[in-house]
Amino acid sequence: MELKKLMEHISIIPDYRQTWKVEHKLSDILLLTICAVISGAEGWEDIEDFGETHLDFLKQYGDFENGIPVHDTIARVVSCISPAKFHECFINWMRDCHSSDDKDVIAIDGKTLRHSYDKSRRRGAIHVISAFSTMHSLVIGQIKTDEKSNEITAIPELLNMLDIKGKIITTDAMGCQKDIAEKIQKQGGDYLFAVKGTQGRLNKAFEEKFPLKELNNPEHDSYAISEKSHGREEIRLHIVCDVPDELIDFTFEWKGLKKLCVAVSFRSIIAEQKKEPEMTVRYYISSADLTAEKFATAIRNHWHVENKLHWRLDVVMNEDDCKIRRGNAAELFSGIRHIAINILTNDKVFKAGLRRKMRKAAMDRNYLASVLAGSGLS
């Protein structure tokens, strides 16, 4: 995952500025922005300040003939970049440097950039859908929608950009759509979808197939996990079965459907053992030939997108507090954060959390150079 490869892909992004007015190359501005975000920059002024402090370092990788651009120039140039071209470069870069694994679970989930709305221009907050490799903890693709409700139409567009052959694609209930299932199958992947309560017939079929008696004493393949933490105990039971004859009609509606899956969780407070545990039941459908244990692993991996991506973006990078709104800048800056997370996550030299890695990159040029060079990366 070397910076050189990334910059080769970024070099194809068109620069729409008038040539005679250009003082700072587009590639230099993007290089500066990426390095600054890796080092903890959260806005345009942070990026300018980083550049002024690290100009001699940056000249090892770019030209910077006219020094560091001011923050207004950085903001103006980045906001005019084509998001489609940027996402294309990002995905091609990840394909080039990230080895594919047929056992991978790709979690697709969306996140709203809360402060990206622009009241004065009547523009709502943007919603970014990410494809996350749970095996490698890397973002492998992203696409923007204007609202969460548009995920249904955006997910197929994102899938078009990805190589999902042999992978299991997981989504939340919003992505549980027949058209999406068919598209995943056509691209050689398998799906594992959470079933929506609004899907009446399918939801009812699950309720009839898995009554409370079956959940307490499963007759089908099952796998249980018990965990204790912070004074609480949770038992998670996973049940998987083939599609029974009485529900065979669903295999014509959902392409490739093979398994009905149920996840049951029993939560209790250890100090209050006399109380009945809180019970939650979730239904899933899958085209993959899953065992109960593999099903448990897959749905647990799906939540890595929350813990290893969204949490990092919000808590470590303060994405929700970012008020960058100009032009395409909010969407582009989201993608640059993904680049920074990928580069830092893949660094195996300094074994620390993302926040410490960012601080070290800001303070230690040798470490930043090591990260950019792909030193110690898989």
UniProtKB/Swiss-Prot annotation:
InterPro entries: ISAs1_transpos, Transposase_11, Transposase_11-like, YbfD_N. Disulfide bonds: none annotated. GO terms for biological process: DNA transposition. GO terms for molecular function: DNA binding; transposase activity. Belongs to the transposase 11 family. This is H repeat-associated putative transposase YhhI. It comes from Escherichia coli (strain K12).
